[in-house]
């Protein structure tokens, strides 16, 4: 059995203040490339993980995938009351801790395959509870389930009183309060510089603890842009308004914190992609992935990206929104 999952761009967290009894909230876009493709079989004495093209995989990503796959197998077997061994073949992958949500997609994909192989079919939000994902942002879980442009409503502070990243939070996935198709003719160019250090683990937890709560005025400014500019732009297919909203949120609230923690090259990249004609350019999650949104001048923006990355290690990927979730092929 094979599963193909999308990746996601995390545009911003919404409310890391909590004055009105909720925290978190997220805005994101499900994207077609890069993607994960996993194949699973059961009937093995132990767990076996095979990586196609593992020679191209850096050691940190390889180790991270192995840990997450094994944890997802153990958690799902425990849920099912089984001690089954599985073979997982990782056919396609993308780097961990790159701002594209590989951890959530990988954990959900492994659990989904195990559940399906054993005759169970659960919702993504239920699977997320099994594998411990979606405790801060619900964008990755919703991308796996339904795709599209997604806004989630965060968590009640009574059930999640602390400001924590998803990897350290035991909260259940938040409710999805808006989901729309993104226009097919909008192109997304991803520029992924190779980063020597990435934000994850204790480092990520420490950032939340140091910078939160975010001032209420910042949250109010962000939600105004989201409700009265970004969301209507998606519904009306207004690329310029959507891009302008993406540009605006880079300098507000927690997203500004994420941006300020980047290497100077990342912000240089963002400025130059905007100058090249992209309608909007942003940082996905904690980066290092930068995304540019455009329609007619994709080649010019890709050319600029290649020029900027000429003496840098990394990847440039041309992608589009995916308005559906993960696909299983039996």
Model features per residue range: what roles?
Residues 1-98, 115-124, 323-324, 329-330:
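ATP-binding N-lobe of GHMP and related small-molecule kinases
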Residues 2, 12-14, 18-23, 123-276, ...:
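ATP-dependent small-molecule kinase catalytic core of the GHMP/sugar-kinase superfamily
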Residues 6, 85, 145, 283-288:
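Short Gly/Ser/Thr- and Asp/Glu-enriched loop/turn motifs at secondary-structure junctions
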Residues 39, 180, 277-284:
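Short, flexible, solvent-exposed loop/turn segments with mixed acidic/basic and small polar residues
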Residues 40-42, 53, 193, 292-296:
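Short beta-strand-to-loop capping motifs
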Residues 70-71, 75, 105-120, 291-295, ...:
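Extended, folded domain segments that form the structural surfaces/walls around functional sites
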Residues 91-116, 136-144, 281-285:
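Glycine/serine-rich anion-binding loops at beta->alpha junctions
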Residues 263-266, 284-291:
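Small/polar glycine-rich anion-binding or flexible loop at a beta-alpha turn
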């Amino acid at each position: 059995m094979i599963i193909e999952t999308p990746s996601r761009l995390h545009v911003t967290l919404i409310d890391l203040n909590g004055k009105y009894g909720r925290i978190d909230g997220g805005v994101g876009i499900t994207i077609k490339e890069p993607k994960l493709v996993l194949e699973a079989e059961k009937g093995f004495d132990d767990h076996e993980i095979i990586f196609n093209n593992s020679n191209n995989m850096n050691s940190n990503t390889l180790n991270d995938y192995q840990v997450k796959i094994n944890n997802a197998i153990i958690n799902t077997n425990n849920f099912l009351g089984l001690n089954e061994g599985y073979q997982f073949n990782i056919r396609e992958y993308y780097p961990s801790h790159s701002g594209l949500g590989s951890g959530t997609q990988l954990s959900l994909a492994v659990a989904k395959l195990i559940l399906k192989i054993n005759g169970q079919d659960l919702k993504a939000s239920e699977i997320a509870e099994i594998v411990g994902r979606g405790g801060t942002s619900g964008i990755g879980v919703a991308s796996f389930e339904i795709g599209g442009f997604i806004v989630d409503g965060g968590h009640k502070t009574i059930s999640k009183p602390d400001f924590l990243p998803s990897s350290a939070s035991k909260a259940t996935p938040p409710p999805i309060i808006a989901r729309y198709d993104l226009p097919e003719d909008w192109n997304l160019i991803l520029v992924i510089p190779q980063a020597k250090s990435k934000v994850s683990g204790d480092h990520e937890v420490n950032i939340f603890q140091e910078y939160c709560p975010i001032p209420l005025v910042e949250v109010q400014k962000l939600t105004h842009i989201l409700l009265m500019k970004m969301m209507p732009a998606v519904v009306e297919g207004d690329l310029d308004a959507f891009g302008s909203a993406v540009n605006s949120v880079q300098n507000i609230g927690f997203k500004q914190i994420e941006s300020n923690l980047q290497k100077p090259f990342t912000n240089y990249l963002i400025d130059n992609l905007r100058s090249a004609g992209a309608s909007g350019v942003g940082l996905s999650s904690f980066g290092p992935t930068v995304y540019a949104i455009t329609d007619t001048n994709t080649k010019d923006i890709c050319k600029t990206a290649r020029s900027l990355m000429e003496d840098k290690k990394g990847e440039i990927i041309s992608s589009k929104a995916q308005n559906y979730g993960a696909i299983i092929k039996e």
